[in-house]
Design a protein with these regions (language model features):
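Conserved serine/cysteine hydrolase catalytic core
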Residues: 139-196, 202-205
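A catalytic-pocket lid/entrance helix-loop region that shapes and gates access to the active site
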Residues: 82-112
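Conserved alpha/beta-hydrolase catalytic His-Asp/Glu region
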Residues: 112-152
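Alpha/beta-hydrolase active-site loop signature
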Residues: 15-19, 83, 210
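Conserved acidic catalytic loop of the alpha/beta-hydrolase fold
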Residues: 33-50
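Conserved HGGG/HGGXW glycine-rich cap/lid loop of the alpha/beta-hydrolase fold
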Residues: 1-28, 48
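Conserved hydrolase catalytic core segment
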Residues: 48-91
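Catalytic active-site module of serine/aspartate enzymes centered on a nucleophile-bearing elbow/loop
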Residues: 200-235
Length: 235
């Protein structure tokens, strides 16, 4: 974010359950359009048109925002948007989304049992590799465990999204779609479907990076995002 802030007006809002974001609704399952509605004041503050940058869940939210209001979005830079509903719609289970589906179920069960550390281990090891959680310093675990409580909500929103793949055919703005070649099949399956569908897409694969590439290698990923945004600043 600091790198981009030197050249762009950067706004970094929180979604439900994160930072200053609202709590998850208790009376119903949240859908991604709810996130878009929550972010409307930020979009208004950004002015039109604006570019959206998102990773994982945030990338999925950015895609839905663009579908609902394409005239406001100048460009999209997305690192592995996790819109798993697209995989289920294209290929009936069992499919490439099964790994994360099972991980969400196991993490949710662990949370219900009051074992956040177990939930975190399921989630982190799925995305980053077996043993990564046990190798994580104790000083860093608390912050990670605090975010793990969102796993059930994330899973519901991402697997139950009803926007069809064909809707993304109408997105004419430039899209930078990024993935790591060490990422799990679930994330890469979403990227593959979107690459075949988006009409103005650039696919960028990072060698030896995984799903958490923007966190583990921010300079590499942010350099690509900066290049893309600069090239499309006047689109």
């Amino acid at each position: 974010m600091d790198r981009l802030a030197t050249r762009f007006h950067v706004l970094a809002p929180d979604t439900h359950g994160a930072g200053k974001g609202p709590v998850w609704p208790e009376d119903r399952a949240l859908v991604l359009e709810d996130e878009v509605t929550w972010l409307e004041p930020v979009f208004s503050r950004a002015g039109t048109p604006f570019s959206l940058v998102g990773h994982s869940y945030g990338g999925a939210v950015a895609l839905i925002a663009a579908v609902h209001q394409p005239e406001r979005v100048r460009a999209l830079a997305l690192y592995e948007p996790t819109l798993f509903s697209l995989v289920d719609a294209a290929y009936l289970p069992p499919n490439d989304a099964d790994g994360i589906r099972q991980t969400v179920e196991r993490a949710t069960t662990a949370l219900a049992a009051g074992t956040r550390d177990v939930a975190a281990e399921h989630f982190i090891d799925y995305w980053m590799g077996k043993g990564v959680w046990q190798a994580t310093p104790l000083a860093r675990r608390g912050a990670i465990e605090a975010t793990i409580v969102n796993v059930h909500g994330w899973g519901q929103a991402l697997f139950n999204e009803n926007t069809p793949l064909q809707a993304f055919c109408a997105l004419e703005m430039p899209v930078l779609l990024m993935e790591g070649d060490n990422s799990p099949p679930s994330a890469r399956a979403v990227v593959s479907l979107l690459t075949q569908t988006l009409p103005n897409v650039e696919l960028l694969e990072f060698e030896e990076l995984g799903h958490m590439g923007p966190v583990t290698h921010p300079e590499v990923v942010n350099r690509a995002i900066e290049r893309f945004l600069c090239c499309n600043a006047a689109v």
